[in-house]
Structures are given as structure tokens and as C-alpha cells.
From Swiss-Prot:
Protein name according to UniProt: Protein Smg homolog
PANTHER family in the cross-refs: PROTEIN SMG (PTHR38692:SF1)
Domain of life per record: Bacteria
Pfam families membership: DUF494 (PF04361)
Sections of the chain in a coiled coil: none
Family: Belongs to the Smg family.
UniProt source species: Xanthomonas axonopodis pv. citri (strain 306)
InterPro entries to which the protein is assigned, alphabetical: Smg
Length: 157
């Protein structure tokens, strides 16, 4: 049986959300499909809670990118996100793929996963899911998706 929240989220994203974002509202049919795919009801419930928290934290108005102070990570964040993950978040912010609010949302959603540590690939999926859920972030989402699925990622312009 597949047992992590991230596994459930990735399955949902790859099989459902990439085709129709409105499917997230139909928890019953999604849950049945996930159970048939081998996920436990407990992990499915946690994944739905994760998605609900993501949609509740959606910013109401897109803010322009402003250069602000560097984010200082604290204990649990340092434990969960290695230097590659933290460097990647800084890279995304410096290249205006994420703004400060989106970075904080990515951090919140990464910390909400039931894993002791996240590797860079896991964090990239969290970033992709957050951007997918952000109004006005279509270009950033498209760039991030390209980074994940192409053998040779395109550079940031």
C-alpha cells in the first residue's frame, strides 16, 4: 500500500488535476479512485486536508515582486529542508518565479507533509502544486512544469 501524503498528492496531480482542476471538489469520486489505486483512507483524508489548506491560503490579490530581506529558516524547517531545497527556493524567488507570499505558502505546505525530510524533487512537486493553485501564476507554473518534465530545462529569462 502507498502510504505518504505526498504520494497521494502526486497521484492526484498526475492523474486528475493536470486535466481538470475542478475535480478537486468531488472528494467522493476521487477518494474511490484513490482507494482503488491502493491508498489508505487515512492518507487520502490527510491529502484532502492538505489541499483544502492550500486553497484556503490562496492570496486574494497578486502583489508585485519586491526585493525584500533574505528568508531565515528555523529549526524544523532546517531539519526538513536541506541546503539544496533552501537554495532552490531562493533561486525561485530571485528569478521571480515565486514571490515572498508564495514562498511562505510553499514552506507551509512542505512543512505540513508527514515526512521528516524532503528532497529537492519532492519540494519541486510542492512548488508546482502551489503555483497550480495560484491565480495569476500561469507563467510561473508553466516554467516550473518545464523544469520538471523536460530533460534539458529552459533557462530563466
Amino acid at each position: 500500500m502507498k502510504e505518504s501524503i505526498l504520494d497521494v498528492l502526486l497521484y492526484l496531480f498526475e492523474h486528475y488535476f493536470s486535466e481538470d482542476a475542478d475535480l478537486v471538489r468531488d472528494h467522493d469520486s476521487l477518494q474511490n479512485g484513490l482507494i482503488q489505486a491502493g491508498f489508505s483512507p487515512a492518507e487520502i483524508s490527510k491529502a484532502f486536508d492538505w489541499l483544502d489548506a492550500l486553497s484556503e491560503q490562496r492570496p486574494s490579490v497578486a502583489r508585485p515582486h519586491v526585493d525584500g530581506p533574505v528568508r531565515i529558516y528555523h529549526g524544523p524547517e532546517l531539519d526538513k529542508l536541506d541546503v539544496d531545497c533552501r537554495g532552490f527556493l531562493l533561486f525561485l524567488e530571485q528569478h521571480r518565479i515565486l514571490d515572498a507570499d508564495q514562498r511562505e505558502l510553499v514552506l507551509d505546505r512542505a512543512m505540513a507533509l508527514d515526512q521528516d525530510e524532503l528532497d529537492l524533487d519532492d519540494l519541486k512537486w510542492v512548488v508546482l502544486m502551489v503555483l497550480f493553485n495560484q491565480p495569476g501564476a500561469e507563467a510561473a507554473y508553466a516554467w516550473m512544469e518545464t523544469q520538471m518534465f523536460l530533460d534539458e530545462p529552459e533557462p530563466v529569462h
